[in-house]
């Protein structure tokens, strides 16, 4: 009955056009070629050492936190992502309900030296959020670069500076 009422008001539903613009087609082709073998779920504390060593060797690491809230002051830490080389990254679950989650305090203790090391650049999107989340856990991030702020400084009024927009523009 609800469907017939909707049809009487709005008419028969029409399928979207199958025409795909070039930008969407190129993007989907690029996605289909992504090799996921170098994206790792960290399942034990010892695996983190390899990622710390790599970040120290390279001198920079992209870092991102996953949390339970968009408010960093109220957010609980759920996971941490690290990436020092293109096409290679890891995710460390610390607040998941599954058995794959690693003890948060032990992970924080292990990552503290790296994240506070001023000789290793930490790169993030809206990294001030991550700064607050880590600070709540006793880590003071140092030597940070924020892609959101970089975008704003370079093109303040040109675009939005969120990750989706920046990905569309630069990737």
Predicted segments — roles?
Residues 1-80, 94-114:
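Long, highly charged low-complexity segments
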Residues 37, 71, 75-171:
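Active-site-proximal helix-loop-helix substrate-binding element of RNase H-like nuclease domains
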């Amino acid at each position: 009955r609800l469907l017939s009422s909707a049809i009487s008001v709005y008419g028969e539903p029409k399928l979207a056009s199958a025409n795909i613009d070039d930008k969407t087609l190129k993007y989907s082709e690029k996605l289909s070629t992504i090799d996921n073998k170098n994206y790792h779920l960290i399942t034990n504390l010892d695996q983190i050492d390899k990622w710390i060593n790599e970040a120290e060797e390279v001198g920079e690491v992209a870092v991102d936190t996953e949390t339970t809230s968009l408010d960093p002051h109220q957010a609980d830490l759920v996971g941490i992502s690290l990436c020092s080389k293109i096409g290679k990254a890891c995710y460390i679950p610390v607040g998941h309900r599954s058995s794959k989650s690693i003890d948060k305090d032990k992970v924080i203790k292990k990552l503290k030296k790296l994240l506070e090391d001023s000789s290793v650049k930490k790169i993030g999107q809206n990294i001030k959020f991550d700064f607050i989340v880590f600070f709540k856990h006793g880590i003071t991030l140092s030597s940070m670069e924020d892609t959101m702020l970089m975008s704003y400084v370079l093109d303040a009024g040109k675009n939005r500076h969120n990750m989706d927009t920046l990905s569309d523009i630069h990737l």
